Structures are given as C-alpha cells and as structure tokens.
Amino acid sequence: MQIITDPAEMQKIAEKLRLQHQYIGVVMTMGALHEGHLSLVKLAKEKAGTVIMSIFVNPTQFGPDEDFHRYPRPFEKDVALARSAGIDYLFAPTTEAMYPEGYSTSIDPGPVATRFEGASRPGHFGGMATVVVKLLGITRPHLAVFGEKDAQQLAIIRRVVTDLNIGTTILGAPIARESDGLATSSRNIYLSSDERQQATALYRAILYAGEQIEQGRADLEAIAAEAEELVLSEKDTQPDYLCFVDDATFERATKAVPGKAYRLIMAVRIGSTRLIDNWRFDYQ
C-alpha cells in the first residue's frame, strides 16, 4: 500500500492507472476506521481492480458547535487497517493541501441539502459535496462507494455527480451494524456504557416500523410518531428528527403509495453524542 499526501501526486498516479486501463474504485473516509468502512472497502474490491482510500477530516462540513477538533484521528491504526483490508493507495492530504491559500470555490447541492441533516447542520452538505467533488477529481475513480447509513449524503452525492456530469458510478453499501443492531459509527466511542445501551432504541424503532409496514399499514406519519415514542422511552434521548421520506427526493412522506420507495430516517442525541440511522423499503 502506498501512502500519498500530495493531491497533484495522487492525481498523476490515478491518471497513469487509467492509461493502464485499471478500473479504479474509491472509498472516502474521515478516518477512525471501523467495520462499516471495511465493508465499503470489501464492496469496492469486489467491483474494482485498484482501490484508493482517502482519509481527510474535512473542516468545511463541521458546524461551529460540532466536534471537528474532538473527532478521533488514530492515523497509525487507520493505516494498519487500510493495509490489512487490501487498499492499494491511501490518500491522506492535509487541510492546507486541500484548501490552499486563495481557495474560494464551493458547491451548493440545492434544496435537499436544507432538510433534516441540512437543517440541523447548516452548511454541512455544501462542505461535504465540495470535498467529494475535489476527491473525485483527484482520485479519478470509475466507481465510488458510500455507506447507506448517511442516506441523505448518498442522495446528494448522486444528485451532484449526475448534475455535474462527473461520470463516476456511485454505489451505496448496506449499513454495517453491531450485534445488537446499533449502526457502526466513529462517534459510538463517545457513548458511555449506559448511553450505549440507550442507543439500541434507534434500531428497535426501525424494527417496530418494519413490523408495522409488514402488516400493511400505510400511515407513515403515525408509525413514525409511535417509533419516536419508543426512542423517547429511553432516558436522555432527544430526537432531532424521526420521520419517513421519499427515498428519491428526501421530501417528508406521510402516507405510503404502492410501488414507491421510502426511508425511515432519524437523528437522535444521546447525552452529548448525535447518532443517525435509517431504513429503506419498497412499499407493495
């Protein structure tokens, strides 16, 4: 595995790989690697001959009250995990390399970026979309793999790549979960033992909603309210949002229509830690 920190060098390597007709896959991360990231790598390796991983804690997608400086950065451990996972190139630029003096360009992903995560974290998706486009330009991949856990992010990336004719295939990978259903996340390490137990309420809410849909209920607004009550039954839980959305547009959905895809999305604060989760389904 080769470690590269210079964007120009990474771009030069990627261009050479393309000339050699290598099919390139990329997995973009902010480090603090866990099983969720490794599942993305596994999928990328199944699809691509050469896999690049980026590790970059992007400051432009953190709000003023968020955990940029607190965000874990166990770089040596990440390098070991990336190497053992079979990564070919690890791209780990500095902030100064990605945003040099005079940098002024940013991407506005449109209305979908102002809902839910976008409403709770103003500016987050603009910063995310900008760095994703930069990383696509630097690594020149044919395929990029992103996790379904960040479902709104995935929808925005697909929109941006389509709108800007970037030509990279965007592949969503299933959510990796712990044995009790909690979605794997770099932020899980912030949870105390009590909070870790309380966090299982998110997955229990998903299971409850799934049971209701299986029974044929279409009243999504009522199901979401019941699922939220289940989350609130745990102490110190504060949902930012918990609702169903149209899976394509991320507009709030109140009643299911046969033949359409929907997603239950949620963001819940447990103590000082904010967790997200979701579940997608096709309504029959």
Swiss-Prot record:
Record InterPro entries: Cyt_trans-like, Pantoate_ligase, Pantoate_ligase_C, Rossmann-like_a/b/a_fold
Record key words, sorted: ATP-binding, Cytoplasm, Ligase, Nucleotide-binding, Pantothenate biosynthesis
Naturally occurring in which organism (per UniProt): Chlorobaculum parvum (strain DSM 263 / NCIMB 8327) (Chlorobium vibrioforme subsp. thiosulfatophilum)
Active site positions: H37
Family recorded in the similarity comment: Belongs to the pantothenate synthetase family.
Residues annotated as binding ATP: 30-37, 147-150, 176, 184-187
Residue sites binding beta-alanine per the record: Q61
Reactions listed under catalytic activity: (R)-pantoate + beta-alanine + ATP = (R)-pantothenate + AMP + diphosphate + H(+)
Function: Catalyzes the condensation of pantoate with beta-alanine in an ATP-dependent reaction via a pantoyl-adenylate intermediate.
Gene Ontology, cellular component aspect: cytosol
Subcellular location, record wording: Cytoplasm
Any one biological process term the GO annotation gives: pantothenate biosynthetic process
Protein's name according to its UniProt entry: Pantothenate synthetase
